[in-house]
Amino acid sequence: MMNDAKRNQFREDDEEDRLIDWGSTQSLQSQFFDRRPAVVARQLLGCGFARRIEGVWVGGWIVETEAYLSSRDAASHSARGEKPGNASMFGRPSTLYVYPIHAKHCVNLVTESVGCGSAVLIRALQPVWGIDRMFQHRGLHRSETTDGRALTTGPGRLCQSLAIDRTCDGVDPIRDPNWCVFSGPKLPSSRVTTTPRIGISQAAELPLRFFVDGNRYVSGLVRHHRRPRRDSL
């Protein structure tokens, strides 16, 4: 079961709690991540990812991921071996590997055993908790016409909304009380689409991107979806 303190904090913080059957919610354990990145990337879809900032939980459901392999993957940061900047990618499974790109950041969850150098990039969330705080972090004004896609669609926006930067690199969200990764809505295989990864120039042909088909918070092209991109979990 999810840690009682974390569960109670979620209940106190957000009206969206009514949508969640907390009795069936479980925090993911290190064993979940100690598997091949493609398997983890697929099974993270529909899971919750959140952190607590100044007493407020911010986060949502994972709706898009990409797997980065420990070998034969030129796009992976581990392709040239362990270095100071990517050391967390070789750490314990479930560790956060955060790296900067174009003045923004990307957040990954490390997979497989220590020293392997594989991870799953979280590309998009469906925002659920602490939405007002996320708008503040993004420097946006919330209104009835503001699209929530501006918060957590794409890895850079996602990190900005959750105030994730290099200071978060190396954190283990399974053990840190201010982070949480937990099970969520179960997705049938018909709701999951697999495509090549996007936004990279090497090994771009590998089918290692996974997303919730039809979910409006997924990044990338509409034509990648089999159903209209307007649904939520």
UniProtKB/Swiss-Prot annotation:
Coiled coil: none annotated. It comes from Rhodopirellula baltica (strain DSM 10527 / NCIMB 13988 / SH1). Its EC number is 3.2.2.-. Keywords: DNA damage, DNA repair, Hydrolase. This is Putative 3-methyladenine DNA glycosylase. It comes from the Bacteria. GO terms for molecular function: alkylbase DNA N-glycosylase activity; DNA binding. The gene is mpg. Pfam families: Pur_DNA_glyco. The keyword Metal-binding does not apply. One of its GO terms (biological process) is base-excision repair. Belongs to the DNA glycosylase MPG family.
